[in-house]
């Protein structure tokens, strides 16, 4: 797995995966280690604490949504799929995104992961765009 890092433009990892891949206990040091290997955007998911994203010259932290969790199966995939969809829809490479755009995309991804966790199963729990937007409008952010 480590040998593939230089081939990735965008990586999404959990805090535990980051330490395993980089050997760094510090979240920031681990993310910067990925960037030093050629990753353009490193996103670390932190469960109830939301996520942190790192790109050259940029670090953003976004809280997640305060939903009633039933099953987290598929939440990470939902998060990453939503993030990738937004980046692709923007027509920009990760390094071309403004901090505001990236922040909005991360918020959308957090809403996708949070919404997924309100249902059981993996594929059946994947939220629609409408469900994600409803979460963003109606569910308060979780500040841990």
Where are these regions (language model features)?
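Conserved beta-alpha-beta core of the PfkB/ribokinase-like small-molecule kinase fold
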Residues: 1-32, 49-50
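Conserved phosphate-binding/catalytic region of the ribokinase-like
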Residues: 23-144
